Amino acid sequence: MKLSFDLKKKNGNARRGQLTFERGTVQTPAFMPVGTYGTVKGMTPEEVKGTGAEILLGNTFHLWLRPGQEVMKMHGDLHDFMNWHGPILTDSGGFQVFSLGKMRKITEKGVHFRSPVNGDKIFMDAEKSMEIQKDLGSDIVMIFDECTPYPATHNEAKKSMEMSLRWAQRSRDHFDKLENPNNLFGIVQGGVYEDLRDVSIKGLTEIGFDGYAVGGLAVGEPKEDMHRILEHTCPQLPEDKPRYLMGVGKPEDLVEGVRRGIDMFDCVMPTRNARNGHLFVTGGVIKIRNAKHKTDTTPLDPHCDCYTCQHYSKSYLHHLERCNEILGARLNTIHNLRYYQRLMESIRKAIDEDRFDEFVTEFYERRGREVPPLAKEQ
């Protein structure tokens, strides 16, 4: 089913909306937990839903390698396979291929690489990506693109962006040929170069997509460049389509993305950091392994309503971390995912109440920091 996007309110550049799918609604700005292999690591779908998540991200590349398309089709689709019946967005596999480094060779046709699972020679292109994502039953399908590395010269970024545009057209054509009833998002590329981003946006909007992602950021570039590119890019994207910042990020990055007009985010940070004992709280980050928490009988965050904070102390979580107990990673993950969803809930409430600027100020004050200036203010 084609999504509908209802842009309900704006407060400055911050946008408050609702995405409606056949499988449910998603309030925006939204954060999508990452379920790389058909699971948010260590969590049941019910637990993930209990944190407030309304949409998940699945990984086309990894699910293609394991368990494969045939197993997926035996179950129906990814929703049935993992027992998550809300909306799912799947990335196209482009970033994972980019991450393989020397193990892959990129050509106009697509990407040749060796499987990180068993070393087999594999080829992926725009058409294959569209076919896999249709079999996954993805509510939002991402085009196949090349993630421009950082650093890249203007000429390197230009060639990469132009090839991604050609792949975008191929993705659109094959998506339509497959008669996929769901939604296809374009991905803006162009590195840190504003003129290349302009060309990418123009090409993508001429092709026409159900939503637009900003890709090729959070790949090593300075934060100032990411903010500058977002400020330049977002105003040029269609007002009535959702905007998705891929692979971002820290709580501060989510706030800064919303300040610049982003509606959707995903990142492994809350789950990966949880497994490493780095826990997000109102004032910043707690490293639960540190010795000072051994005798601290207070909850992680007195403002948090998650299962972990309602039932366990820092002392207990410290003990689990020191003993490498699986329960520790699970409780940490529940907390971090709930922190991210509470952050998004607070952002949405602030936009609804026309007090987003005040929210941003308070957010940074609790961290003992100044609000970063917008690029146009510098």
Swiss-Prot record:
<feature type="region of interest" description="RNA binding">
    <location>
        <begin position="247"/>
        <end position="253"/>
    </location>
</feature>
<dbReference type="GO" id="GO:0005829">
    <property type="term" value="C:cytosol"/>
</dbReference>
<feature type="active site" description="Proton acceptor">
    <location>
        <position position="91"/>
    </location>
</feature>
<dbReference type="GO" id="GO:0002099">
    <property type="term" value="P:tRNA wobble guanine modification"/>
</dbReference>
<feature type="binding site">
    <location>
        <position position="335"/>
    </location>
    <ligand>
        <name>Zn(2+)</name>
    </ligand>
</feature>
<feature type="active site" description="Nucleophile">
    <location>
        <position position="266"/>
    </location>
</feature>
<feature type="binding site">
    <location>
        <begin position="91"/>
        <end position="95"/>
    </location>
    <ligand>
        <name>substrate</name>
    </ligand>
</feature>
<dbReference type="GO" id="GO:0046872">
    <property type="term" value="F:metal ion binding"/>
</dbReference>
<feature type="binding site">
    <location>
        <position position="306"/>
    </location>
    <ligand>
        <name>Zn(2+)</name>
    </ligand>
</feature>
<comment type="similarity">
    <text>Belongs to the queuine tRNA-ribosyltransferase family.</text>
</comment>
<feature type="binding site">
    <location>
        <position position="304"/>
    </location>
    <ligand>
        <name>Zn(2+)</name>
    </ligand>
</feature>
<comment type="function">
    <text>Catalyzes the base-exchange of a guanine (G) residue with the queuine precursor 7-aminomethyl-7-deazaguanine (PreQ1) at position 34 (anticodon wobble position) in tRNAs with GU(N) anticodons (tRNA-Asp, -Asn, -His and -Tyr). Catalysis occurs through a double-displacement mechanism. The nucleophile active site attacks the C1' of nucleotide 34 to detach the guanine base from the RNA, forming a covalent enzyme-RNA intermediate. The proton acceptor active site deprotonates the incoming PreQ1, allowing a nucleophilic attack on the C1' of the ribose to form the product.</text>
</comment>
<feature type="binding site">
    <location>
        <position position="216"/>
    </location>
    <ligand>
        <name>substrate</name>
    </ligand>
</feature>
<dbReference type="GO" id="GO:0008479">
    <property type="term" value="F:tRNA-guanosine(34) queuine transglycosylase activity"/>
</dbReference>
<feature type="binding site">
    <location>
        <position position="145"/>
    </location>
    <ligand>
        <name>substrate</name>
    </ligand>
</feature>
<dbReference type="InterPro" id="IPR036511">
    <property type="entry name" value="TGT-like_sf"/>
</dbReference>
<dbReference type="InterPro" id="IPR004803">
    <property type="entry name" value="TGT"/>
</dbReference>
<keyword id="KW-0671">Queuosine biosynthesis</keyword>
<keyword id="KW-0479">Metal-binding</keyword>
<keyword id="KW-0808">Transferase</keyword>
<feature type="region of interest" description="RNA binding; important for wobble base 34 recognition">
    <location>
        <begin position="271"/>
        <end position="275"/>
    </location>
</feature>
<dbReference type="Pfam" id="PF01702">
    <property type="entry name" value="TGT"/>
</dbReference>
<dbReference type="GO" id="GO:0008616">
    <property type="term" value="P:queuosine biosynthetic process"/>
</dbReference>
<keyword id="KW-0819">tRNA processing</keyword>
<comment type="pathway">
    <text>tRNA modification; tRNA-queuosine biosynthesis.</text>
</comment>
<feature type="binding site">
    <location>
        <position position="189"/>
    </location>
    <ligand>
        <name>substrate</name>
    </ligand>
</feature>
<keyword id="KW-0862">Zinc</keyword>
<keyword id="KW-0328">Glycosyltransferase</keyword>
<dbReference type="InterPro" id="IPR050076">
    <property type="entry name" value="ArchSynthase1/Queuine_TRR"/>
</dbReference>
<protein>
    <recommendedName>
        <fullName>Queuine tRNA-ribosyltransferase</fullName>
        <ecNumber>2.4.2.29</ecNumber>
    </recommendedName>
</protein>
<comment type="subunit">
    <text>Homodimer. Within each dimer, one monomer is responsible for RNA recognition and catalysis, while the other monomer binds to the replacement base PreQ1.</text>
</comment>
<dbReference type="InterPro" id="IPR002616">
    <property type="entry name" value="tRNA_ribo_trans-like"/>
</dbReference>
<dbReference type="GO" id="GO:0101030">
    <property type="term" value="P:tRNA-guanine transglycosylation"/>
</dbReference>
<feature type="binding site">
    <location>
        <position position="309"/>
    </location>
    <ligand>
        <name>Zn(2+)</name>
    </ligand>
</feature>
